[in-house]
């Protein structure tokens, strides 16, 4: 009987550990995806509106 209890506790413990590892990996991939999205948004903003010195206009005024 004690052998069954020990093996049951071992199985439950290993299941808990593996599920926590899976959750960590899932969180890491979600964070990486969010970082990639933020980088893409910042690159799009740079393409749309490049930084210019104050008072500079792309048009010539005579």
Swiss-Prot record:
Subcellular location(s) per record: Secreted
Molecular function per GO: toxin activity
Residues found modified as Sulfotyrosine: 62
Chief site of localization: secreted
UniProt entry tagged with the keyword Chloroplast: no
UniProtKB keywords: Amphibian defense peptide, Bradykinin receptor impairing toxin, G-protein coupled receptor impairing toxin, Secreted, Signal, Sulfation, Toxin
Residues annotated as signal peptide: 1-19
Skewed-composition ranges (Basic and acidic residues): 43-52
Compositional bias segments (type: Acidic residues): 30-42
Pfam families on file: FSAP_sig_propep
Tissue specificity note: Expressed by the skin glands.
Transmembrane segments: none
One of the GO biological process terms: defense response
Propeptide residue intervals: 20-48
Modification after translation, per record: Asp,Pro,Glu-[Thr6,Val10]-phyllokinin and [Thr6,Val10]-phyllokinin occur in sulfated and nonsulfated forms. [Thr6]-bradykinin and Des-Arg-[Thr6]-bradykinin are nonsulfated.
Family label: Belongs to the frog skin active peptide (FSAP) family. Bradykinin-related peptide subfamily.
Name listed for the protein in its UniProt record: Phyllokinin-1
Organism encoding this protein: Pithecopus azureus (Orange-legged monkey tree frog)
């Amino acid at each position: 009987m004690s052998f069954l209890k020990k093996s049951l506790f071992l199985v439950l413990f290993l299941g808990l550990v593996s599920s926590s590892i899976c959750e960590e990996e899932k969180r890491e991939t979600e964070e990486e995806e969010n970082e990639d999205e933020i980088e893409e948004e910042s690159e799009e903003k740079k393409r749309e509106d490049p930084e210019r010195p104050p008072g500079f206009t792309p048009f010539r005024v005579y």
